[in-house]
Swiss-Prot record:
Protein name: UPF0246 protein lp_0089
Pfam families, per the entry: H2O2_YaaD (PF03883)
Highest rank taxon of the organism: Bacteria
Stored InterPro entries: YaaA (IPR005583)
Assigned GO CC terms: cytosol
Source organism: Lactiplantibacillus plantarum (strain ATCC BAA-793 / NCIMB 8826 / WCFS1) (Lactobacillus plantarum)
Single biological process term from Gene Ontology: response to hydroperoxide
Family: Belongs to the UPF0246 family.
Length: 248
């Protein structure tokens, strides 16, 4: 069983909690992307990032001096968005840390796919960014099926806790009869079931923590996710879609 999650835009450098233990497997491709990004002018980079000057300028300055081999932070600690704060990996037990290194994978526009203890540096590049590289018109074409091949060398269930933007790098390449279970955290709004992005990110982080703490290796056991605000809805769920309803 493999679990996939999305990265976060907000990143930090943290070399104190845990050391980086492994190297990203597609570092050569990351170097290729870095070279392409460093050729962009400031206006081109700002357009690619869809952000204000306040965010674009420091990111552009950082881009010019990125070194992929120095000041590395384990990926699981480098991202500091809502999902990662609610996961709280810095307080995981050793068995929980071992679990995520074996089972959890972070999908990334810049690094492709990451194990939690792969050493990385801060970057800004979303998977849906319109960056052409060589013959590839965008990052989906650039990465192709490589993320899937690294995720599951042998067909096994995939637990999708990633956003659609990132899950699209895996779903088209599933082996015949291989299951990918989408985890849906939804709320009733005006009588309709909808997903609130912030609440979903919080719940995804909490679920990763739950899976790691309980060493979950059976897909059906995911339904027992213990959360004060969410309850598994068997009626609205299917074999490949587990729905959890917000209770407030």
């Amino acid at each position: 069983m493999k679990i996939i999650i999305a990265p976060a835009k907000k990143m930090i450098i943290d070399q104190d909690a845990f050391p980086a233990l492994t190297e990203p497997i597609y570092l050569d491709q990351t170097q290729q992307l870095l070279a392409q990004l460093q050729h962009l002018t400031y206006p081109e980079a700002k357009t690619l990032w869809h952000c204000s000057d306040k965010l674009a300028q420091p990111n552009y300055d950082w881009l010019q001096k990125i070194d992929l081999t120095r000041n590395l932070t384990p990926a699981i600690l480098s991202y500091s968005g809502i999902q990662y704060r609610y996961m709280a990996p810095d307080v995981f037990t050793q068995p929980a840390l071992d679990y995520i290194q074996a089972n959890l994978r972070i999908l990334s526009g810049f690094y492709g796919i990451l194990r939690p203890f792969d050493g990385i540096v801060p970057y800004r590049l979303e998977m849906q960014a319109r960056l052409a590289v060589g013959q590839a018109k965008n990052l989906y074409a650039f990465w192709g099926d490589r993320l899937y091949q690294a995720l599951t060398p042998r067909p096994e269930p995939i637990i999708n806790l990633a956003s659609q933007e990132y899950a699209k790098t895996i779903a088209p390449y599933l082996a015949p009869h291989q299951s990918m279970i989408d985890i849906v955290f939804a709320s009733f709004i005006d009588g309709k079931l909808k997903t609130k992005a912030t609440l979903a990110r919080m719940a995804r982080g909490a679920m990763v923590r739950f899976l790691a703490e309980h060493q979950i290796d059976d897909v059906t056991a995911i339904r027992t996710f213990d959360h004060p605000d969410y309850q598994f809805d068997e009626k609205r769920s299917t074999a490949n879609r587990f729905v959890f309803i917000y209770q407030h």
